[in-house]
Amino acid sequence: MTKSSDERLVKNAELAEKLSALHEQKTVMIASLNADTSPLISYAPFVEKEGAFYIFISYLAEHTPNLIERPQASVMLTADESTTANLFVRGRVRYEVECTVIERDNTLFDEVLVDLEQRQGKMVSLLRTLGDFYLIRLQPTMGSLVVGAGAAYRF
C-alpha cells in the first residue's frame, strides 16, 4: 500500500468512528412538511435496524401525519453540546429519508419493537397498547456528515 492509501484508510476509520458515535444518540431530529408545505421540526426516540431508523409515534403528534402523507423527510443526529468544544462546528449527520409505515401485522413490527424497547426502555410496552401509535421506517437515501470546520462529507 502507498502512503496515501494508508492515510485514506486511517481517515476513513476516523470518519466511521465519528459517524458511529453520532448513531449512539437515542433521539433523532426530524424535519417534515405540514399539509400547507410549511416546515416542522420535531424529534423522536429511535432504533436502527438493517440501515434504517425506526420511530414509534402517535398519530396525535404533529409530525406523524406529515411523515405518512408526505413520506420524504430529513433527519439529523448531533453530537452532545456538553462535549462540543466549538458549537459552530458541532458534529452532526443528516440524512434524506423515505418514510414507510410498518403495519402491526407485519413480522417486522414485533422485531423492531423488541429492539426499540431494549434501546429505549419499558415505556415502549405501554405505548404498544395504544392504537394511535405507528411504527415508521425512515430509510436513508443520502447523507451528509460534518465533523469539524471545513470537514463535511456527502455519501
Which sequence ranges carry the predicted segments?
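Binding-site signature for planar aromatic cofactors or substrates
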Residues: 1-155
